[in-house]
From Swiss-Prot:
It comes from Enterobacteria phage K3 (Bacteriophage K3). It is a single-pass type II membrane protein. The gene is T. Pfam families: Phage_holin_T. Residues 1-34 are cytoplasmic. This is Holin.
Length: 218
């Protein structure tokens, strides 16, 4: 005849352990050590019961931290490349003011920031407010850039972070750059306060080269 099978539920085991630990009414350090054992057992039980969830949460948090680090490094590298290319553009174009604009959030383009500039800021722009300007996607410059074409004007300056007229600007020339997702990500723009500037063919060559390099870094 087979022996009867005895089963224990988790609650039976728990109360059995508690009974063993506290049945002698111990006090002081002995009691404290036993309470510590109970807490440890409780934590081990939670880890055992929900181990997969804890491990998944740990992996997710590590991945998010790693992604944030990579994103910060990429942004820092892009800003360095942007400044380097802008210096070349500014000198080669003989512009009075040049800027690299970057859109955010990534691939959505709701706001625009000046992330680097060379030359003298227009009188209507403050160095303290170079970022967070809303993007008007109906403007000619934006729609022209979406098609990969360069833009120039002597009266419309879509991305300058100001609503005030800027009469000292007589001419501007800009070209778009596209990120690694092939999404319009920002512009390189040159401005002149005087009437004379080098030919658009030359500006196209200067701007296109910088835009390709920025696109690979973005």
């Amino acid at each position: 005849m087979a022996a009867p099978r005895i089963s224990f539920s988790p609650s039976d085991i728990l109360f059995g352990v508690l009974d063993r630990l506290f049945k002698d009414n111990a006090t002081g350090k002995v009691l404290a050590s036993r309470v510590a054992v109970v807490i440890l057992l409780f934590m081990m039980a939670i880890v055992w019961y929900r181990g997969d969830s804890f491990f998944e949460y740990y992996k997710q948090s590590k991945y998010e931290t790693y992604s944030e680090i990579i994103e910060k490094e990429r942004n820092a590298r892009f800003e360095s490349v942007a400044l380097e290319q802008l210096q070349i553009v500014h000198i080669s174009s003989e512009a009075d003011f040049s800027a690299v604009y970057s859109f955010r959030p990534k691939n959505l383009n709701y706001f625009v920031d000046i992330i680097a500039y060379e030359g003298k800021l227009p009188s209507t722009i403050s160095e303290k407010s170079l970022g967070g300007y809303p993007v008007d996607k109906t403007m000619d410059e934006y729609t022209v850039h979406l098609n990969g074409r360069h833009y120039y004007s002597n009266s419309k300056f879509a991305f300058l972070p100001t609503k005030k007229p800027t009469p000292e600007i007589n001419y501007m020339y800009s070209c778009p750059y596209f990120n690694l997702d092939n999404i319009y990500a920002g512009t390189i723009t040159m401005y002149w306060y005087r009437n004379d500037h080098i030919s658009n063919d030359r500006l196209e060559s200067i701007c296109s080269q910088a835009a390709r390099i920025l696109g690979r870094a973005k």
